[in-house]
Amino acid sequence: MFKESPIIRRVSRQIMVGNVPVGGDAPITVQSMTNTLTTDVAATVAQIKALEAVGADIVRVSVPTMDAAEAFREIKKQVNVPLVADIHFDYRIALKVAEYGVDCLRINPGNIGNENRIRSVVECARDNNIPIRIGVNGGSLEKDIQEKYTEPTPEALLESAMRHVDILDRLNFNEFKVSVKASDVFLAVESYKLLAKQIDNPLHLGITEAGGLRSGSVKSSVGLGLLLAQGIGDTIRISLAADPIEEIKVGFDILKSLKLRSRGINLIACPSCSRQEFDVVSTVNALEQRIEDIMTPMDVSIIGCIVNGPGEAMVSDLGLTGSSKKSGYYLDGIRQKERFDNTDLVDQLEQRIRAKARSMSERLDEKNKIDILTKD
Protein backbone atom coordinates (compact mmCIF):
# COMPACT_ATOMS: atom_id res chain seq x y z
CA MET A 1 0.00 0.00 0.00
CA PHE A 2 1.04 3.59 -0.61
CA LYS A 3 1.66 5.24 2.76
CA GLU A 4 2.29 8.58 1.05
CA SER A 5 0.72 10.09 -2.04
CA PRO A 6 2.73 9.58 -5.26
CA ILE A 7 1.18 12.78 -6.63
CA ILE A 8 3.62 15.56 -7.51
CA ARG A 9 1.81 18.85 -7.05
CA ARG A 10 1.99 21.63 -9.59
CA VAL A 11 4.36 24.40 -8.54
CA SER A 12 2.38 27.51 -7.61
CA ARG A 13 2.84 30.79 -5.82
CA GLN A 14 1.57 31.10 -2.28
CA ILE A 15 -0.91 33.67 -1.02
CA MET A 16 -2.36 34.18 2.43
CA VAL A 17 -6.11 34.13 3.08
CA GLY A 18 -6.13 35.54 6.57
CA ASN A 19 -3.71 33.31 8.45
CA VAL A 20 -4.18 30.37 6.06
CA PRO A 21 -1.60 29.81 3.29
CA VAL A 22 -2.94 28.77 -0.11
CA GLY A 23 -0.64 27.44 -2.81
CA GLY A 24 3.07 26.70 -2.77
CA ASP A 25 3.88 23.86 -0.40
CA ALA A 26 0.88 24.55 1.86
CA PRO A 27 -1.64 21.75 2.44
CA ILE A 28 -4.61 21.81 0.08
CA THR A 29 -7.31 23.71 1.93
CA VAL A 30 -10.98 22.79 2.16
CA GLN A 31 -13.62 25.49 2.16
CA SER A 32 -17.37 25.91 2.04
CA MET A 33 -19.92 28.70 1.68
CA THR A 34 -22.73 29.77 3.96
CA ASN A 35 -26.30 29.37 2.70
CA THR A 36 -27.96 31.56 5.31
CA LEU A 37 -29.18 35.10 4.69
CA THR A 38 -26.07 37.15 5.35
CA THR A 39 -28.22 39.84 6.94
CA ASP A 40 -29.22 37.26 9.56
CA VAL A 41 -26.03 37.72 11.54
CA ALA A 42 -26.81 35.18 14.27
CA ALA A 43 -27.68 32.38 11.82
CA THR A 44 -24.66 33.10 9.63
CA VAL A 45 -22.25 33.20 12.57
CA ALA A 46 -23.69 29.93 13.90
CA GLN A 47 -23.19 28.24 10.54
CA ILE A 48 -19.64 29.54 10.16
CA LYS A 49 -18.75 28.25 13.62
CA ALA A 50 -20.29 24.87 12.79
CA LEU A 51 -18.21 24.71 9.60
CA GLU A 52 -15.07 25.62 11.51
CA ALA A 53 -15.84 22.89 14.05
CA VAL A 54 -15.79 20.20 11.35
CA GLY A 55 -12.53 21.48 9.89
CA ALA A 56 -13.28 24.21 7.35
CA ASP A 57 -10.08 26.12 6.61
CA ILE A 58 -11.86 29.02 4.87
CA VAL A 59 -15.52 30.05 4.62
CA ARG A 60 -17.08 32.13 1.84
CA VAL A 61 -20.01 34.44 2.50
CA SER A 62 -22.25 35.97 -0.16
CA VAL A 63 -22.44 39.76 0.12
CA PRO A 64 -25.08 40.84 -2.44
CA THR A 65 -26.06 44.24 -0.98
CA MET A 66 -24.74 47.07 1.15
CA ASP A 67 -26.99 45.86 3.96
CA ALA A 68 -25.26 42.49 3.70
CA ALA A 69 -21.91 44.29 3.82
CA GLU A 70 -22.90 45.92 7.10
CA ALA A 71 -23.96 42.51 8.42
CA PHE A 72 -20.63 41.08 7.25
CA ARG A 73 -18.87 43.61 9.46
CA GLU A 74 -20.59 42.15 12.53
CA ILE A 75 -20.10 38.57 11.37
CA LYS A 76 -16.35 39.09 10.96
CA LYS A 77 -16.05 40.26 14.55
CA GLN A 78 -17.58 37.04 15.88
CA VAL A 79 -15.65 34.32 14.03
CA ASN A 80 -12.04 33.16 13.76
CA VAL A 81 -11.91 31.30 10.45
CA PRO A 82 -10.83 33.39 7.41
CA LEU A 83 -13.78 34.78 5.45
CA VAL A 84 -14.06 35.32 1.71
CA ALA A 85 -16.65 37.85 0.51
CA ASP A 86 -18.46 36.71 -2.62
CA ILE A 87 -19.05 39.80 -4.77
CA HIS A 88 -21.14 40.10 -7.94
CA PHE A 89 -22.31 43.09 -9.99
CA ASP A 90 -21.57 45.95 -7.58
CA TYR A 91 -17.83 46.52 -7.14
CA ARG A 92 -18.53 49.09 -4.41
CA ILE A 93 -19.55 46.27 -2.07
CA ALA A 94 -16.02 44.89 -2.39
CA LEU A 95 -14.61 48.25 -1.36
CA LYS A 96 -16.91 48.33 1.66
CA VAL A 97 -16.12 44.84 3.01
CA ALA A 98 -12.42 45.57 2.53
CA GLU A 99 -12.84 48.25 5.19
CA TYR A 100 -14.38 45.63 7.47
CA GLY A 101 -11.44 43.23 7.46
CA VAL A 102 -12.43 40.67 4.83
CA ASP A 103 -9.71 38.05 4.27
CA CYS A 104 -10.26 37.59 0.53
CA LEU A 105 -12.43 39.06 -2.22
CA ARG A 106 -14.05 36.84 -4.83
CA ILE A 107 -15.01 38.76 -7.97
CA ASN A 108 -16.81 37.32 -11.00
CA PRO A 109 -15.32 38.53 -14.32
CA GLY A 110 -18.69 37.97 -15.97
CA ASN A 111 -20.48 40.67 -14.00
CA ILE A 112 -18.08 42.81 -11.97
CA GLY A 113 -17.86 45.47 -14.68
CA ASN A 114 -15.20 47.29 -16.68
CA GLU A 115 -11.48 47.62 -16.05
CA ASN A 116 -11.86 50.86 -14.12
CA ARG A 117 -14.04 49.09 -11.56
CA ILE A 118 -11.58 46.23 -11.32
CA ARG A 119 -8.77 48.76 -10.84
CA SER A 120 -10.66 50.26 -7.89
CA VAL A 121 -11.06 46.82 -6.31
CA VAL A 122 -7.40 45.95 -6.87
CA GLU A 123 -6.12 49.21 -5.41
CA CYS A 124 -8.34 48.73 -2.37
CA ALA A 125 -7.17 45.12 -1.98
CA ARG A 126 -3.54 46.20 -2.22
CA ASP A 127 -3.99 48.97 0.35
CA ASN A 128 -5.61 46.53 2.78
CA ASN A 129 -3.35 43.54 2.04
CA ILE A 130 -6.28 41.44 0.81
CA PRO A 131 -5.97 38.71 -1.86
CA ILE A 132 -8.47 38.30 -4.68
CA ARG A 133 -10.03 35.28 -6.33
CA ILE A 134 -10.85 35.63 -10.01
CA GLY A 135 -13.88 33.36 -10.05
CA VAL A 136 -14.89 32.42 -13.59
CA ASN A 137 -18.09 30.40 -13.97
CA GLY A 138 -19.38 28.72 -17.12
CA GLY A 139 -22.88 29.99 -16.38
CA SER A 140 -21.97 33.68 -16.23
CA LEU A 141 -19.34 34.43 -18.85
CA GLU A 142 -18.93 37.93 -20.28
CA LYS A 143 -21.39 38.73 -23.07
CA ASP A 144 -18.73 39.09 -25.77
CA ILE A 145 -17.19 35.73 -24.84
CA GLN A 146 -20.62 34.08 -24.91
CA GLU A 147 -21.21 35.51 -28.39
CA LYS A 148 -17.77 34.46 -29.60
CA TYR A 149 -18.02 30.82 -28.48
CA THR A 150 -21.87 30.48 -28.47
CA GLU A 151 -21.60 28.09 -25.48
CA PRO A 152 -19.25 27.50 -22.56
CA THR A 153 -16.06 25.77 -23.71
CA PRO A 154 -12.68 25.29 -22.03
CA GLU A 155 -11.26 27.96 -24.32
CA ALA A 156 -14.06 30.37 -23.36
CA LEU A 157 -13.47 29.91 -19.63
CA LEU A 158 -9.73 30.26 -20.15
CA GLU A 159 -10.15 33.49 -22.13
CA SER A 160 -12.34 34.98 -19.41
CA ALA A 161 -9.82 34.05 -16.73
CA MET A 162 -6.76 35.26 -18.65
CA ARG A 163 -8.42 38.55 -19.53
CA HIS A 164 -8.62 39.37 -15.83
CA VAL A 165 -5.27 37.80 -14.96
CA ASP A 166 -3.75 40.18 -17.51
CA ILE A 167 -5.51 43.14 -15.89
CA LEU A 168 -4.15 42.22 -12.46
CA ASP A 169 -0.70 41.65 -13.94
CA ARG A 170 -0.74 45.10 -15.55
CA LEU A 171 -1.69 46.56 -12.19
CA ASN A 172 1.27 44.70 -10.66
CA PHE A 173 -1.02 42.80 -8.29
CA ASN A 174 0.13 39.24 -7.61
CA GLU A 175 -1.91 38.22 -4.58
CA PHE A 176 -4.65 36.29 -6.33
CA LYS A 177 -5.96 32.82 -7.06
CA VAL A 178 -8.14 31.72 -9.96
CA SER A 179 -11.03 29.33 -10.57
CA VAL A 180 -12.73 28.23 -13.80
CA LYS A 181 -15.79 26.34 -12.59
CA ALA A 182 -18.46 24.58 -14.60
CA SER A 183 -21.26 22.15 -13.78
CA ASP A 184 -20.04 19.75 -16.46
CA VAL A 185 -17.14 17.62 -15.22
CA PHE A 186 -15.27 17.45 -18.54
CA LEU A 187 -15.67 21.17 -19.17
CA ALA A 188 -14.33 22.04 -15.74
CA VAL A 189 -11.44 19.58 -15.90
CA GLU A 190 -10.27 20.70 -19.35
CA SER A 191 -10.61 24.37 -18.37
CA TYR A 192 -8.44 23.90 -15.30
CA LYS A 193 -5.84 21.93 -17.26
CA LEU A 194 -5.54 24.73 -19.81
CA LEU A 195 -5.32 27.34 -17.07
CA ALA A 196 -2.67 25.40 -15.15
CA LYS A 197 -0.39 25.62 -18.20
CA GLN A 198 -0.80 29.40 -18.44
CA ILE A 199 -0.26 30.69 -14.90
CA ASP A 200 1.49 29.78 -11.66
CA ASN A 201 -1.09 31.34 -9.35
CA PRO A 202 -2.94 29.12 -6.87
CA LEU A 203 -5.99 27.38 -8.31
CA HIS A 204 -9.30 27.09 -6.49
CA LEU A 205 -11.03 23.89 -7.67
CA GLY A 206 -14.73 23.16 -7.82
CA ILE A 207 -17.48 21.63 -9.90
CA THR A 208 -20.11 24.33 -9.64
CA GLU A 209 -23.77 23.51 -8.98
CA ALA A 210 -22.81 19.83 -8.76
CA GLY A 211 -26.19 18.69 -7.40
CA GLY A 212 -27.55 17.06 -4.26
CA LEU A 213 -25.57 15.24 -1.60
CA ARG A 214 -25.16 11.93 -3.46
CA SER A 215 -24.94 13.05 -7.09
CA GLY A 216 -22.98 16.19 -6.27
CA SER A 217 -20.47 14.28 -4.18
CA VAL A 218 -19.91 11.83 -7.03
CA LYS A 219 -19.49 14.55 -9.68
CA SER A 220 -17.16 16.54 -7.46
CA SER A 221 -15.12 13.48 -6.54
CA VAL A 222 -14.66 12.53 -10.19
CA GLY A 223 -13.87 16.05 -11.40
CA LEU A 224 -11.64 17.15 -8.57
CA GLY A 225 -10.07 13.71 -8.32
CA LEU A 226 -8.97 13.87 -11.96
CA LEU A 227 -7.33 17.25 -11.39
CA LEU A 228 -5.82 16.58 -7.98
CA ALA A 229 -4.33 13.29 -9.20
CA GLN A 230 -2.45 15.34 -11.81
CA GLY A 231 -1.16 17.70 -9.14
CA ILE A 232 -3.55 20.52 -10.03
CA GLY A 233 -5.31 22.39 -7.24
CA ASP A 234 -4.46 24.35 -4.10
CA THR A 235 -7.85 24.81 -2.43
CA ILE A 236 -11.17 23.04 -3.01
CA ARG A 237 -14.86 23.66 -2.49
CA ILE A 238 -17.47 20.93 -2.95
CA SER A 239 -20.67 22.61 -4.17
CA LEU A 240 -23.67 20.67 -2.88
CA ALA A 241 -27.37 21.39 -2.56
CA ALA A 242 -27.07 20.14 1.02
CA ASP A 243 -25.92 21.17 4.46
CA PRO A 244 -22.56 22.98 3.95
CA ILE A 245 -21.06 20.77 6.65
CA GLU A 246 -21.34 17.88 4.18
CA GLU A 247 -19.16 19.85 1.75
CA ILE A 248 -16.32 19.90 4.26
CA LYS A 249 -16.66 16.19 5.00
CA VAL A 250 -16.66 15.25 1.31
CA GLY A 251 -13.75 17.59 0.60
CA PHE A 252 -11.58 16.00 3.25
CA ASP A 253 -12.61 12.52 2.11
CA ILE A 254 -11.44 13.32 -1.43
CA LEU A 255 -8.07 14.56 -0.18
CA LYS A 256 -7.78 11.60 2.17
CA SER A 257 -8.47 9.10 -0.63
CA LEU A 258 -5.61 10.62 -2.66
CA LYS A 259 -3.38 10.80 0.42
CA LEU A 260 -3.00 14.52 -0.13
CA ARG A 261 -4.16 15.43 3.35
CA SER A 262 -4.79 13.11 6.28
CA ARG A 263 -7.50 13.94 8.76
CA GLY A 264 -9.71 11.56 10.68
CA ILE A 265 -10.42 7.87 10.23
CA ASN A 266 -9.91 6.18 6.88
CA LEU A 267 -12.50 3.44 7.21
CA ILE A 268 -11.89 0.44 4.95
CA ALA A 269 -14.95 -1.81 4.81
CA CYS A 270 -16.14 -4.62 2.56
CA PRO A 271 -19.54 -4.33 0.81
CA SER A 272 -20.51 -7.62 2.52
CA CYS A 273 -21.74 -10.89 1.03
CA SER A 274 -23.03 -14.25 2.25
CA ARG A 275 -19.61 -15.03 3.74
CA GLN A 276 -19.90 -12.25 6.33
CA GLU A 277 -19.76 -13.44 9.93
CA PHE A 278 -21.41 -10.26 11.27
CA ASP A 279 -23.60 -7.50 9.86
CA VAL A 280 -20.93 -5.39 8.20
CA VAL A 281 -23.24 -2.67 6.87
CA SER A 282 -24.97 -1.85 10.16
CA THR A 283 -21.66 -2.08 12.05
CA VAL A 284 -19.90 0.33 9.70
CA ASN A 285 -22.81 2.79 9.58
CA ALA A 286 -23.08 2.92 13.36
CA LEU A 287 -19.33 3.14 13.83
CA GLU A 288 -18.93 5.98 11.32
CA GLN A 289 -21.35 8.13 13.29
CA ARG A 290 -19.62 7.33 16.57
CA ILE A 291 -16.08 8.18 15.43
CA GLU A 292 -16.59 11.12 13.08
CA ASP A 293 -15.27 13.51 15.75
CA ILE A 294 -11.84 11.83 15.77
CA MET A 295 -9.32 13.94 13.84
CA THR A 296 -6.27 11.68 14.23
CA PRO A 297 -5.31 10.14 10.85
CA MET A 298 -5.78 6.39 11.13
CA ASP A 299 -6.57 3.40 8.88
CA VAL A 300 -9.28 1.10 10.26
CA SER A 301 -10.39 -2.00 8.34
CA ILE A 302 -13.71 -3.74 8.97
CA ILE A 303 -13.94 -6.91 6.87
CA GLY A 304 -16.68 -9.50 7.29
CA CYS A 305 -14.75 -12.69 6.57
CA ILE A 306 -11.28 -14.23 6.35
CA VAL A 307 -10.89 -13.93 2.57
CA ASN A 308 -9.51 -10.37 2.53
CA GLY A 309 -9.80 -9.53 6.22
CA PRO A 310 -6.33 -10.58 7.42
CA GLY A 311 -4.60 -8.93 4.46
CA GLU A 312 -6.34 -5.60 5.00
CA ALA A 313 -5.87 -5.77 8.77
CA MET A 314 -2.12 -6.32 8.42
CA VAL A 315 -1.72 -2.95 6.65
CA SER A 316 -4.12 -1.05 8.93
CA ASP A 317 -3.59 0.67 12.25
CA LEU A 318 -6.54 -1.31 13.57
CA GLY A 319 -8.40 -4.12 11.86
CA LEU A 320 -11.30 -6.49 12.38
CA THR A 321 -11.68 -9.77 10.50
CA GLY A 322 -14.97 -11.62 10.69
CA SER A 323 -15.01 -15.10 12.15
CA SER A 324 -17.69 -17.35 13.63
CA LYS A 325 -19.18 -15.90 16.85
CA LYS A 326 -16.01 -13.94 17.67
CA SER A 327 -13.96 -11.89 15.21
CA GLY A 328 -10.21 -11.44 14.98
CA TYR A 329 -8.68 -8.14 16.10
CA TYR A 330 -5.45 -6.64 14.72
CA LEU A 331 -3.42 -3.76 16.09
CA ASP A 332 -0.63 -2.21 14.01
CA GLY A 333 -0.92 -5.15 11.63
CA ILE A 334 -0.41 -7.77 14.35
CA ARG A 335 -3.16 -10.20 15.29
CA GLN A 336 -4.09 -9.94 18.96
CA LYS A 337 -5.08 -12.78 21.26
CA GLU A 338 -8.20 -10.86 22.17
CA ARG A 339 -11.29 -11.56 20.04
CA PHE A 340 -14.46 -9.51 19.74
CA ASP A 341 -17.94 -10.89 20.37
CA ASN A 342 -19.88 -10.41 17.12
CA THR A 343 -22.97 -9.29 19.05
CA ASP A 344 -21.22 -6.24 20.53
CA LEU A 345 -18.80 -5.04 17.88
CA VAL A 346 -19.57 -1.32 17.69
CA ASP A 347 -18.90 -0.55 21.36
CA GLN A 348 -15.74 -2.66 21.39
CA LEU A 349 -14.42 -1.10 18.20
CA GLU A 350 -15.16 2.44 19.30
CA GLN A 351 -13.28 1.92 22.57
CA ARG A 352 -10.21 0.48 20.80
CA ILE A 353 -10.25 3.13 18.06
CA ARG A 354 -10.39 5.98 20.58
CA ALA A 355 -7.58 4.45 22.62
CA LYS A 356 -5.47 4.01 19.49
CA ALA A 357 -6.22 7.57 18.37
CA ARG A 358 -5.07 8.94 21.73
CA SER A 359 -1.88 6.90 21.55
CA MET A 360 -1.10 8.03 17.99
CA SER A 361 -1.88 11.65 18.84
CA GLU A 362 0.45 11.57 21.85
CA ARG A 363 3.25 10.09 19.73
CA LEU A 364 2.71 12.75 17.08
CA ASP A 365 2.79 15.52 19.68
CA GLU A 366 6.03 14.12 21.09
CA LYS A 367 7.56 13.90 17.61
CA ASN A 368 6.62 17.51 16.91
CA LYS A 369 8.27 18.60 20.17
CA ILE A 370 11.46 16.76 19.21
CA ASP A 371 11.41 18.30 15.73
CA ILE A 372 11.06 21.79 17.22
CA LEU A 373 13.93 21.19 19.66
CA THR A 374 16.10 19.82 16.85
CA LYS A 375 15.43 22.89 14.68
CA ASP A 376 16.24 25.21 17.58
From Swiss-Prot:
GO terms under biological process: isopentenyl diphosphate biosynthetic process, methylerythritol 4-phosphate pathway; terpenoid biosynthetic process
GO molecular function, one term: iron ion binding
Catalysed reaction equations from the record: (2E)-4-hydroxy-3-methylbut-2-enyl diphosphate + oxidized [flavodoxin] + H2O + 2 H(+) = 2-C-methyl-D-erythritol 2,4-cyclic diphosphate + reduced [flavodoxin]
Keyword 4Fe-4S part of the UniProt annotation: yes
Disulfide bridge partners, by residue number: none
Binding site for [4Fe-4S] cluster: C270, C273, C305, E312
Cofactor binding, note field: Binds 1 [4Fe-4S] cluster.
EC number: 1.17.7.3
Keyword DNA damage: no
InterPro entries: Dihydropteroate_synth-like_sf (IPR011005), Enolase-like_C_sf (IPR036849), IspG_bac (IPR016425), IspG_bac-typ (IPR004588), NO2/SO3_Rdtase_4Fe4S_sf (IPR045854)
Superkingdom, taxonomy of origin: Bacteria
Function: Converts 2C-methyl-D-erythritol 2,4-cyclodiphosphate (ME-2,4cPP) into 1-hydroxy-2-methyl-2-(E)-butenyl 4-diphosphate.
Family assignment from sequence similarity: Belongs to the IspG family.
Listed NCBIfam families: ispG_gcpE, PRK00366.1
HAMAP family named among the record's database cross-references: IspG (MF_00159)
Name the UniProt record assigns to this protein: 4-hydroxy-3-methylbut-2-en-1-yl diphosphate synthase (flavodoxin)
